[in-house]
Amino acid sequence: MRKITVFLVIVSLVFLILGFSAFGQNIKYGGTLRVVYAIGSNLIPNFSPYNPSPINILPLIYESLFDVNILNGQTTPLLGTSYKWEDNDLKLVVNIRQGVKWSDGTPFTANDVAFTFNYLKQNPSIDLSGIWAPSSYLESVQATGGNVIFSFYKANTPFFLNLATRPIIPEHIWSRVKNPSEWDNPEPIGTGPFIVKNVNVPNNTVTLTKNPNYWMKGRPYVDNIAYTVVLSNTTALEMLLANKADLVGAFIPNIQQIWANRNPSINKYWWPVYSINILLFNTLKYPFNNSIFRRAVNFAINKSSLEEKAYYNVGGTANPTGIIPLQLDKWMDPTLTPLASELGSYNSQKAQDLLTSIGFKKNSNGRLVGSNGEVLPTFKILVPVGATDFITMAQIISENLKNVGIYTVIDQEAGSTYMTSLMSGTFDMAISSGAGIGPSPYYLYYSEFNPAFSAQIGQTAISDYSRYTNPLVTAALQVFSSTSDLNLQQQAIYTIERIMLMDLPFIPLTNRTMFGEWSESNFTGFPNESDPYSYSEFMGYAGLYGGELMGLNVHLK
């Protein structure tokens, strides 16, 4: 087999790769950073990286090979120092950092990395990110000297994200755990910058303290992190306003007025866009199987109103391609920008003209009648019960569509029932968050358009709930995943974008954001819009694992 080696050169000097503005300056050490998150439940002191509902601060304890910033695609070395694709992109070779110790003083080696992934293979119930799923095409993981080699039986370069962000566990601890899905790991041993100091269940607080064996000299700056969970966004806001928190993760309505404007020099927030909210069509049902009808619906919806009423204009309206803002420069086909701009506009007359072009007209009651003389029925817009933002958007969409003769009602279903309706295809339209997040648009398109994830109505779809498939899109997805050549990958994404804008299998509505609010009364160095070196939240989820860089960079004023 012809051997092609593609290197991603990553400088191992931490002060260069992390890009921390504070490095080399006169930094003030110490202090306890008070972090409050609204998670809707009380603290469950489970420190297992295999917990389906992981604790947010897990990345401060268990490091991954790399930090992959899904906002902008930036990759930062952690336990891995560099990587390269070999053998026609069938092998991923990761160089493992030397001189690292686990928090109990045991040396960390490449064997720990190989063990982490093979442990998932031995225990499929904890393989939450599908490392060994058939669709990953992963064949083996082996440690060789200071490297770990991931071998694939079919090229799948986007899967780097899953491998790079998997928390690495110590073999000398976990090899003795026979039922990992049932173990809550009360005394976690990691390589990260912090260790667990205290757990106070009545106060819903975990206190972390510096790991004395951490490999990065001079980091972290803060001595401790007190992580508290609360039931509601309101409680989190109250703690922030009362100076009982330094960093909060919560949705705060009208954040600019309620928080930032009170003291602009100190009260800060950054809600970076990481995904989108979409209006799903059931494209196997009439009239949503007609792309012109879908285009008319798109023009009939005032997306700016959705953003204003549901999200107070913080996240912005979504790009019609579904690409998030920080990825547009790299992945948006510039020749499609005018079309995307047009499709993002609100134009009720354009919607009416499109409907007329395919034989629809309004009757005396203002309802659309098809060319067959039948009045369109009242359609349902499916939303989860209690999801106030989705409900608000559904109400506006319903009014917008009524203006062009499409009558709808809002169908609120409980979370599990809502998901069942999406997966089985028993809906007309639905508001949902876009499936698939990652450092490029590929992850959205792969989740939404992969035929393997679709199904006929009544059968279970994994993630292609619109049930839209297109052989040209499928081919482009295959081109992207089979190469590490950026130019080829960009062309593949351009192809999908064009089809997306022509067919509109779903409508991107508004951007989804992370929620990070903080006070700079005591601490500074948080990521922000001008320095997006990390997320504005700690994230411990499979596929969305990060925030360690924020924990390393924040310091006393």
Language-model features: locations:
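Ligand/substrate-recognition segments at binding pockets and active sites
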Residues: 35, 201-203, 358-437, 486, ...
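N-terminal lobe/hinge region of extracytoplasmic solute-binding protein
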Residues: 36-87, 118, 189-191
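A structural "hinge/loop" feature
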Residues: 37-58, 79, 106, 155, ...
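Gly/Pro-rich hinge or "lid" segments in bacterial periplasmic/extracellular proteins
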Residues: 69-70, 164-220, 224, 234, ...
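Surface-exposed binding/hinge segments that line
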Residues: 84, 95, 130-176, 521
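Ligand-site clamp/hinge motif
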Residues: 182, 213-258, 398, 407-409, ...
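Detector for C-terminal structural segments
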Residues: 200, 210, 298-337, 389-398, ...
